[in-house]
Swiss-Prot record:
Annotated GO CC locations: cytoplasm
Ranges where the Exonuclease domain occurs: 7-170
Protein name (database record): Oligoribonuclease
GO MF assignments: 3'-5'-RNA exonuclease activity; nucleic acid binding
One Gene Ontology term from the biological process aspect of the record: DNA metabolic process
EC class (word): hydrolase
Compartment(s) of residence: Cytoplasm
Predominant localisation class: cytoplasm
Protein source organism: Pectobacterium atrosepticum (strain SCRI 1043 / ATCC BAA-672) (Erwinia carotovora subsp. atroseptica)
Keyword Cytoplasm included in the entry's annotation: yes
Family annotation (InterPro entries): Exonuclease_RNaseT/DNA_pol3, Oligoribonuclease, RNaseH-like_sf, RNaseH_sf
Cross-referenced Gene3D superfamilies: Ribonuclease H-like superfamily/Ribonuclease H
Protein function: 3'-to-5' exoribonuclease specific for small oligoribonucleotides.
Length: 180
């Protein structure tokens, strides 16, 4: 159900960190209510990239995306960036009006840079604000370091897994750092 207080969580996997020459290879979204209860999981889409684009990945990306199977999924995917953008937007429009949800995730500014470059209609769907879990992580690390051992990430570097971890991490900080 469409609600302007719902939150859109997003994660991208990319061939690298520079949107000037790296590309999106996976996108996933998840919608929660304002209290962080999951309402719906969106499509998880491998985004096709050419072999020449994939060959530009550094060793970390080759290892990580190869081990997870993402590289193989990208090679056989028929979804380009525009198709993935449109499918994601179609899902989000069922849950959140345009311009209402901040972009939510972990180090989400990096994802937004890629959205701006390769999926501008999706990027514009978000409010200009950010709900970045990494902000709380950095504050907790400095102001209450004793709680840092209480949350461990699996670090699969698969988009939906990363979103679920970001959400769980925010819930952890809400309970143990913000104490709400």
């Amino acid at each position: 159900m469409v609600d302007e207080n719902n939150l859109i969580w997003i994660d991208l996997e990319m061939t690298g960190l520079n949107p000037d020459h790296d590309r999106i290879i996976e996108i996933a979204t998840l919608v929660t209510d304002a209290n962080l209860n999951v309402l719906a999981e969106g499509p998880v889409l491998a985004v096709h990239q050419s072999d020449s684009q994939l060959a530009l990945m550094d060793d970390w990306n080759v290892r990580t995306h190869g081990a997870s199977g993402l590289t193989d999924r990208v090679k056989v995917s028929t979804a380009d960036e525009r198709a993935a953008e449109l499918e994601t937007l179609a899902f989000l429009q069922k849950w959140v009006p345009a311009g209402k949800s901040p972009i939510c995730g972990n180090s989400i500014g990096q994802d937004r840079r890629f959205l701006f470059r390769y999926m501008p209609e999706l990027e514009a769907y978000f409010h200009y604000r950010y709900l970045d879990v990494s902000t709380l992580k950095e504050l907790a690390r400095r102001w209450k370091p004793e709680i840092m051992a209480g949350f461990k990430k699996q670090g699969t570097h698969q988009a939906m897994d990363d979103i679920r971890e970001s959400l769980a991490e925010l819930v952890y900080y809400r309970e143990n750092f913000l104490r709400l």
